Amino acid sequence: MPSLWDRFSSSSSSSSLSRTPTPNQPPRSAWGSAAREEGLGRCGSLESSDCESLDSSNSGFGPEEDSAYLDGVSLPDFELLSDPEDEHLCASLMQLLQESLAQARLGSRRPARLLMPGQLVSQVGKELLRLAYSEPCGLRGALLDVCVEQGKSCHSVGQLALDPSLVPTFQLTLVLRLDSRLWPKIQGLFSSANSPFVPGFSQSLTLSTGFRVIKKKLYSSEQLLIEEC
């Protein structure tokens, strides 16, 4: 099965996507480098701060007020930090993430289709791009672990390597959440290991719009960065 990076590379064969520095080639595009230099001073402060909660159930605003608030956020300026190369790769990553969640196995009896609301897809993508911005290889250097949290339990869904040919420079752990109101519907998924396996999907479950991302640099001894959204 071709890797995510192979699929991404074949769809963008008209441009060189390598970020490995060479004497005659900068590590990123001139446009991306200029944007990075312009926003780097502000990016440093992001490594120690939590992002604002995007879950309207945890905020004092409704969906319209939340949208208006997000439109006014200027730190970081997402347009300044954007990189077309990473944005294209992120879109492919989000598609692969949704496919993995659709085949997730949360218990021993049946797998469940976990569905990401559109708002969650958008916000997770933006957060991954922001956390990858200060990395030497951008999003290509990410190793993404995906977990689903329900109550005090955290269930691993899988690990996604964006470019298997590249040594990862940082690790991201994405912790998604099931809506607590769904708990009566999913208790059967967490049966004991002795219960017989029943093939097929039990049901489709929609994830909460709240999530958490934990970033760990693999080339540095810096403390973990935890982003709560």
Swiss-Prot record:
Top-level taxonomic group: Eukaryota
MF-aspect GO terms: 14-3-3 protein binding
Oligomer and partners: Monomer. Interacts with BTRC. Identified in a complex with CUL4A, DDB1 and BTRC. Interacts with TXNIP; this inhibits the proteasomal degradation of DDIT4.
Entry similarity comment: Belongs to the DDIT4 family.
Subcellular location: Mitochondrion; Cytoplasm, Cytosol
Annotated keywords: Antiviral defense, Apoptosis, Cytoplasm, Mitochondrion, Phosphoprotein, Ubl conjugation
Residue numbers of Phosphoserine PTMs: 16
Function: Regulates cell growth, proliferation and survival via inhibition of the activity of the mammalian target of rapamycin complex 1 (mTORC1). Inhibition of mTORC1 is mediated by a pathway that involves DDIT4/REDD1, AKT1, the TSC1-TSC2 complex and the GTPase RHEB. Plays an important role in responses to cellular energy levels and cellular stress, including responses to hypoxia and DNA damage. Regulates p53/TP53-mediated apoptosis in response to DNA damage via its effect on mTORC1 activity.
Residues where Phosphothreonine is found: 20, 22
Name listed for the protein in its UniProt record: DNA damage-inducible transcript 4 protein
